[in-house]
Structures are given as C-alpha cells and as structure tokens.
C-alpha cells in the first residue's frame, strides 16, 4: 500500500495557506508523500513546474491565483489542461472555463463577501458607516469590493473605500472592514490610530478582517472575520485523494464573531 505522491502548487505561503496545508496533511494521515512548490502568481512558474513534473505525481493540487487579464488566464487554462483530469484538484479559486471532471474546492470571490457580511447585517445596520480598506495588489479586490458595495447599497449602510488606513479615518462607532492579507500593516495602523485616540476595538468601534487565521482568536482580544473555511477546504481535497473520487464543491464562508465587532 504505497504512499500517493502529491504535488501541491500554492501561489504563496501565508497563515491561511498554512491552515489549508495543515488540514490537508492531517487528513491524509501519512498516506500521501507531499511536495510543495510556490508559483508566486507567476504564470511562467506554473508552466515550468507542470513541464518538469508531468507524469511524476499521482495528484496535482493547485491554487490557480494569477493575474486576471485574458492573456494570462488563457495560459493558465492551457497549462492545467495538460494534467489528466483524474489527477487534478483545484483549490481556493474556481475556473468555470476549465472543462472536465477534475476536483475543485473553492471560494466564490464575487459573492462570498456579500453573504459573509449578511451574517452581521443586524449589527451593521446600526453603524453610522462601514469603512472598507482594500488592497490594490490583491487579485480579487474588484470582485470583493463589488460584493461589499452591493451589500451596503441593498441594506442602506453608508460606506467608503480606502486604499490605506490614515489616522483621520479612524472614528468612534464606525466599522472597518480590512480586506488585506492577514495581520499586515493596515490592521496595525488601524490599531495604532485607535490607541492614540483611546478607542477600544469592540467597545468604541468595530473591526472585521477578511480571512480567518490561527492568530484571529488572539489579536485584539479576538478579531471578527469573514472567511472561507480553509480547514474544510484542505480536508475535502485530501478526502478526494483518499477516496479516489473527485468532485467540485464551494466551501463554507461565514462571519466568525469575536470581540472586535
């Protein structure tokens, strides 16, 4: 009963990818020999890794996060089509243009944020304003921003987008949705600006962060997040390999209520 050889091709390593990996690794329970490469959202690296490793692994598990321009996306589809469907599992992003019976466990960047915020709608309707801090370098910032705008407009919640936190935007009673990578500078700047005004998260103003992470429970006495369930995503991908049955499933996305909102 030999170990299955699995190539994990992640875009980058972060606290969320660590959760994904741990869940995948723990579920396989030693039945998979896992190799990890990072493509860094560079299409030429994806092409190179597939070239070098075709036929060497039983399964290829890939997070296809690449620039959304048509030229790059065409190359992504072409590269992924080289892997036999029965050996391919796509993670974290869904590619509707990619045909075939491969496996996929993913989040829906266009709609998930809307449903995540809807889980806190009663509270959000009472706040004077939702301030949304977007990360322009994120591949999906336009999709996520659209979902947030739609949510706010349908529920008549005043909102404004910012690309960074400045002390001037930090005000009592308002809520800040940080769409950045986990625990990066914007969250730190927000906490600092609040501290200098003696404002306490959860008591005087609210913070919601995008993407759950192991640190979320601890930071600011508990950070409220809207996030896909990365543990579920890793587990489902591993189960496909263990059972030898591939399927496509959107993972759960929810608001996890903690102290900060």
Provide a role label for each language-model segment.
Residues 2-111, 115, 175-178, 182:
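Alpha-helical recognition/docking segments in bacterial nutrient-uptake
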Residues 111-153, 249-261:
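An alpha-beta-alpha
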